[in-house]
């Protein structure tokens, strides 16, 4: 199986690249990013391009890929507000999805957010939900949406006091009865859930939409370990 990965330098994307590189089911991984990924390997072909406006053209030229995984995203703080967040989180992802469809990708995997909804009163979740809806409307043979809860892991940049505090609380209650409704998950668990679901065979000749909710991420990650652990 051949894969394209967007967001290979981020928290979930870095883990996804490492796992894809170690998985014997994956023959090649293509990435495009503003800076070089930390993970290297003989199966990885990385293009460094600081101008994200041309990423779609680069992706469109990558033929014969089976899976596209987007773990690309930002926060309103890092994007400088709502307008920047919309341009980056929605705009770049949607352009990449259209390019992937043009390139003949069969399965598109989007790492989204828990409670994402285009009808949400909250801008962040509303934007995530609109992106989900518009990617589903592209009608890939299969669209997979991963909706993790609070994301745990070592971030390179601070995402603000509220989010940092939420992450600390979530890390303390993970694997306890108090985890609800945060559904915390580590970056590698989210990555494994995305990859496991992408590796499953298509079940229909009609466009298929698969949602992996926050309650299912950890379970699906364990399924990856059970089936593919040591798959190098």
From Swiss-Prot:
Classification via Pfam families: HIM1
Keywords for the protein's UniProt record, in alphabetical order: Membrane, Mitochondrion, Mitochondrion outer membrane, Transit peptide
InterPro entries: Him1/Fmp52 (IPR014843), NAD(P)-bd_dom_sf (IPR036291)
Main location, first listed in the record: mitochondrion
Annotated Gene Ontology cellular component terms: mitochondrial outer membrane
Bilayer topology term: Peripheral membrane protein
GO biological process per UniProt: import into nucleus
Highest taxon of source: Eukaryota
Subcellular location: Mitochondrion outer membrane
Family assignment from sequence similarity: Belongs to the FMP52 family.
UniProt-recorded name of the protein: Protein FMP52, mitochondrial
Native organism: Meyerozyma guilliermondii (strain ATCC 6260 / CBS 566 / DSM 6381 / JCM 1539 / NBRC 10279 / NRRL Y-324)
């Amino acid at each position: 199986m051949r894969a394209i990965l967007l967001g290979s330098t981020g928290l979930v994307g870095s883990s996804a690249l490492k796992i894809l590189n170690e998985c014997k089911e994956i023959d090649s991984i293509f990435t495009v990013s503003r800076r070089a990924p930390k993970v290297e390997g003989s199966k990885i072909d990385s293009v460094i391009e600081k101008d994200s406006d041309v990423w779609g053209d680069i992706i469109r030229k990558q033929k014969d890929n089976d899976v596209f995984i987007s773990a690309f995203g930002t926060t309103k703080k890092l994007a400088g507000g709502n307008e920047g967040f919309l341009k980056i989180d929605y705009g770049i992802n949607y352009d990449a999805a259209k390019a992937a469809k043009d390139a003949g990708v069969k399965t598109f995997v989007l790492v989204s957010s828990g409670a994402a909804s285009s009808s949400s009163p909250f801008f962040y979740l509303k934007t995530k939900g609109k992106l989900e809806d518009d990617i589903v409307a592209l009608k890939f043979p299969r669209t997979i949406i991963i909706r993790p809860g609070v994301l745990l892991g070592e971030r390179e940049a601070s995402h603000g006091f509220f989010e940092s505090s939420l992450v600390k609380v979530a890390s303390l209650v993970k694997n306890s009865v108090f985890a609800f409704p945060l559904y915390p998950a580590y970056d590698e668990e989210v990555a494994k859930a995305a990859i496991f679901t992408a590796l499953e065979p298509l079940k229909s000749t009609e466009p298929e939409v698969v949602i992996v909710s926050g309650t299912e991420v950890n379970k699906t990650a364990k399924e990856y370990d059970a089936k593919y652990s040591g798959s190098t």
